[in-house]
C-alpha cells in the first residue's frame, strides 16, 4: 500500500511535467495533468494532499483555477503551491490573492520544491524509492 501523500501537478509544458516528475515522483504519489479541467476532475476523484500549479496555461489559467478551487468548500484548505515563470512582485500578490499557499518561480530547485511541499503537507518526506 502506498502511504505517500498525493501531489497533483498541473502544467501544460511536457518539459516542466518531466522536471516535476524527476523532482517529486520518488517522494510523493504524483499525478500530472496539463490543463485545469483535468485537474478539477482529479481533485474530485483522488485524495490530493497538495496541488502544484502553473499560472500560464491555455483555457483556464492557474490563477482562475486557484480561485475556483478556493470557492469549493471541500478544498478551502487544500495547500496550493504555484510554480511559475511569472516572477514580479505583483505576480506573487496575484497568486496570494487567488488563494495560493506558496509561490515559487521557475526555474525551481527540486529540493526547494520538495521542502515547500513538505512544509505545507505537514507530513515527513517519504524515503526515495
Question: Predicted regions span which residues?
Answer:
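Conserved acidic segment of CheY-like receiver
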Residues: 3-14, 20-21, 51-52
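Acidic, metal-coordinating helix/loop segments flanking the phosphotransfer/catalytic sites
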Residues: 32-50
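Receiver (REC) domain active-site loop signature in two-component systems and cognate sites
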Residues: 57
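Two-component/phosphorelay signaling modules centered on CheY-like receiver
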Residues: 14-32
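C-terminal output helix
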Residues: 108-117
Amino acid at each position: 500500500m502506498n502511504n505517500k501523500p498525493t501531489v497533483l501537478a498541473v502544467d501544460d509544458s511536457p518539459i516542466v511535467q518531466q522536471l516535476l516528475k524527476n523532482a517529486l515522483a520518488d517522494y510523493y504519489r504524483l499525478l500530472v495533468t496539463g490543463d485545469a479541467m483535468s485537474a478539477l476532475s482529479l481533485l474530485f476523484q483522488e485524495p490530493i494532499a497538495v496541488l502544484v500549479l502553473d499560472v500560464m496555461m491555455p483555457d483556464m489559467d492557474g490563477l482562475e483555477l486557484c480561485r475556483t478551487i478556493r470557492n469549493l468548500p471541500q478544498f478551502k484548505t487544500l495547500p496550493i503551491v504555484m510554480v511559475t515563470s511569472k516572477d514580479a512582485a505583483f505576480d506573487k500578490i496575484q497568486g496570494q490573492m487567488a488563494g495560493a499557499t506558496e509561490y515559487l518561480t521557475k526555474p525551481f530547485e527540486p529540493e526547494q520544491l520538495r521542502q515547500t511541499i513538505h512544509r505545507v503537507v505537514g507530513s515527513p518526506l517519504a524515503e526515495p524509492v
